[in-house]
Amino acid sequence: MIQLNEPLTHVRTKPILISLEFESPGRKTIDSVATESVLNSVVKINTFSSKPNICYPWQNKPQKKSKGSGFVIPGKMIITNAHVVANHILVLVIKRGSPKKYKAEVKAIGRECDLAILVIESKEFWEDMNPLELGDMPFLQESVNVIGYPTGGENISVTKGVVSRIESMDYAHGAINLPAIQTDAAMNPGNSGGPVCIGNKVVGVAFQTLGHSNNIGCLIPAPVVKHFITGVEKTGQYVGFCSLNLSYQHMDAQTRSHFKMNSEMTGILIYNINQHSDALNILKKYDVILSIDGVAIENDGTVIIPNRERTRLDDLVSLKQLGETILLKILREGKMHEFNITLRPVQRLVPAGQIDNNPSYYIFAGFVFVPLRKQHFKGSNGEQIVVISEVLADVINVEYYMYKHLKVNSVNKVKVENLKHLCELIEKCCTKDLRLELGDGRVIILDYQFAKSSTSLILERHRVPWAMSKDLMTDQSTTCSSTRLY
């Protein structure tokens, strides 16, 4: 059964909201009949994938095959969902009405927005393939067609419904809250990555359903897709979604009075600014944000867009491009101020459930060190939280066998900055004892030379080919005696 927000892969400074590209309610509605040209631009995607083993990062889990959908866009590219090609080994694309499979490469993948771009070298594939045009955010009750290759058959499927809701929601495959569209059109596993059209224009991409409800399918809106594509076209890679990187609270009448707001003012109260935010040296704790780019902020952190539904203030920021600025109107100690803030993408210490990247790890004396796989903000200096994910049993570590999932604070009293730094500190240790201080206060003491000589035997006994991941091996400054194959 598809659970709440589960992806649909088979087998599992202008005072307007520029980024959402809202049109006036007078826009002419095109009849939502799916034409042959649209259907021919929708493809079936077969993916062979293998997830990394989190506890044993040098291993992969058994291979599996899954099915999804995609569609052709200008530039000889194919749009699909990130979860359709996650951890891919091989991606094959099949055109409508054809048995031939074409090998595809993943050009870019955006986990947060659950989107990916595929490219195919074969000239034959692109014959008679017409790219689909991305439209705008639809309006409530507009009719839409969901097109793709869901479970239940091999031929293309078209289902019809209406736009039932537009609001921000958590993307199941990502780690961010973004605008989304809900529809009552039937959506099933395999629809993921397929276009949702009004006439010949794509207004969304199918990506997940609400499992504990009836007939609620979720779409990635065209403005989010455009943001993703624009970033890839400008930089050649996924650039992410911008954020002010600050925390705020709603304001009731008592709070507004305390912070000297008059009866006509509305806004939200900043209570924390991330140390890596571009706003750190501009905004202050307990500043009140009254508006963003001229759009008033309500006391509950929402904004009102003319002729549209109320939405979160974060949506005024998230779809801006890297390096754009926004104008903030601030109330500080009863006085009004205006500041321009340059926006940067949200950076995470380690994106939850990394995809398409071999996990980083380092093994010494049987202790398996990895970066924490949980959402955290990341500093420009590459700071990470390093934890012990597993202890490969040996006489040297038997007393520490239960010391798993614990943060490593320091090595020989030097604070650990990231996994690479921990590796360097251990490999270049020049003291008799190696001292590891953990996050809960416990300490690990190892005879360094004995531990170093034991590492080779431990790796061989546990059938581990390498003492560290390739990304650590490529660092020439790290001189590791245990990087050879055992």
Curated annotation (Swiss-Prot):
Active site residues per record: 83, 114, 192
Pfam short name (any one): PDZ_3
Main EC class the enzyme belongs to: hydrolase
Keywords of the record: Hydrolase, Protease, Serine protease
Annotated region described as Serine protease, given as residue ranges: 44-229
Biological processes annotated in GO: proteolysis
One function term, GO molecular function aspect: serine-type endopeptidase activity
Stretch forming the signal peptide: none
SUPFAM superfamilies, per database record: PDZ domain-like, Trypsin-like serine proteases
Domain PDZ: from-to ranges: 241-334
Enzyme Commission identifier(s): 3.4.21.-
Record-linked Gene3D superfamilies: 2.30.42.10, 2.40.10.120, 3.20.190.20
InterPro entries in alphabetical order: DEGP_PDZ (IPR041517), DEGP_PDZ_sf (IPR046449), PDZ (IPR001478), PDZ_sf (IPR036034), Peptidase_S1_PA (IPR009003), Peptidase_S1C (IPR001940)
Keyword Protease: yes
Protein family: Belongs to the peptidase S1C family.
Function description: Putative serine protease.
Name of this protein: Putative protease Do-like 13
Organism: Arabidopsis thaliana
